[in-house]
Amino acid sequence: GWDRPAYQWMNAGIKTVGNLEYSFPGVRYLEHDGTSRHWPTGYPDYRLNRYEENNHGHYKSYHVTGEYTDFWGGYWHDDGFGFGHTAEYADKPGKKIWIWGLSPYGMIWEKLLTDSDGQYSEVQSGRLLNQSIGTSYRTPFKHGALSPYVTNAWSERWFPVRGTDGILYATDELAFNIVPGNGQQTLKIYAIAPVSGELLVTSDGNK
């Protein structure tokens, strides 16, 4: 036919210094060949969504899946600052983390690819669930296709988050986190767009 492979990912480089936590909702991650593994806890007990706990093996490539969410992001706990990304899941289901690796194998790229700000990581949004490779034709995870005279259009947004001690969920209007401690849970909210009127919070039917 006339269809041609279509492949689109948006890539942002972010710093890794500052106790970085990746807020990527999901229960599994895909490798490039379609292999599925546990997320966010890896073998044996690594918290893969914490940059500093990826200090094993070589580079990491996590295509996180398993939850139909329209957001993901990251948070530097030492800085009290983070970022979020939103898009309709049907438009951008792919969300990927790339880590060069914390061993000398990976950290050599800090010298080769950066200036003086330290190592970086990549966070990416994609039109597909993973970045497939040649053997992916044997899996459900393949390149998409685009027909002649067809146009694809979508919207995605990036925004800052501050003072929430992490990100549990985000929309185009606000981001929030629930922080446990001292026998209670604290709701922390960061407005992304102007918010007016009453904000009603419910839990198990209680206001």
PLM regions: where:
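Short, hydrophobic/aromatic beta-strand segments
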Residues: 2-8, 168, 197-201
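A contiguous, surface-exposed recognition patch within enzymatic or periplasmic domains that forms
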Residues: 2-151, 159
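Solvent-exposed, conformationally flexible loop/turn segments
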Residues: 148-149, 181-184, 207
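Proline/serine/threonine-rich low-complexity linkers at boundaries of modular beta-sandwich domains
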Residues: 160-173
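Beta-strand-rich binding/interaction modules
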Residues: 184-206
